[in-house]
Amino acid sequence: MWTKIIGVLGGLLLLAACSSAPETAPGGPPGGPGAGGPGGIGSRNALPGSQQDLEASAGDRVFFAFDRSDITPESQQILERQADWLRRYPNVTVTIEGHCDERGTREYNLALGERRAQAVKNVLVALGIPASRLSTISYGKERPAVVGSSEEAYAQNRRAVTTVN
């Protein structure tokens, strides 16, 4: 009798251990809810001036075309919201991280990531944010947001992310 009970409990434990986390919808918009866009997951209860607040209020990332570092009109709108957010919190400093997809050499992508981060910084400075509050770093292709070799993965990895220090 005890053997059967232990066997059933063991089977239930194995089934519970096999459950998976909910998946995000593939092919969703890179700037959609939960991806650092305004109104994303966690917009409630965000500590004012925190990374979570930046993500919920303004969005923390902009995306780039392949092998490009120019700011699109959509990215310009996000950066204007980031500048407004930074004006509300004048003691906050941020780091702008430049990222690339996996194509290209490590050296080339580090330089491209730096150009992307610098392009974002230049826009924020032009919008009145002191350069002393903004630092840049390039991670090239070393820190992908999405692992994969599809166009969707590439598009989400070509980005600049603003992080609160």
What are the language-model segments listed below?
Residues 1-8:
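Bacterial N-terminal signal peptides that target proteins for export
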Residues 14-17:
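C-terminal motif of bacterial Sec signal peptides marking the signal peptidase cleavage site
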Residues 19-93:
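Periplasmic peptidoglycan-binding/tethering modules of Gram-negative envelope proteins
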Residues 74-81, 107, 111, 115, ...:
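Extracytoplasmic/secreted proteins, especially bacterial periplasmic and envelope-associated proteins
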Residues 91-99, 114-145, 158-165:
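A non-catalytic structural micro-motif
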Residues 147-150:
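Short beta-alpha junctions and helix-cap segments that line functional grooves
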Residues 152-156:
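A generic structural micro-feature
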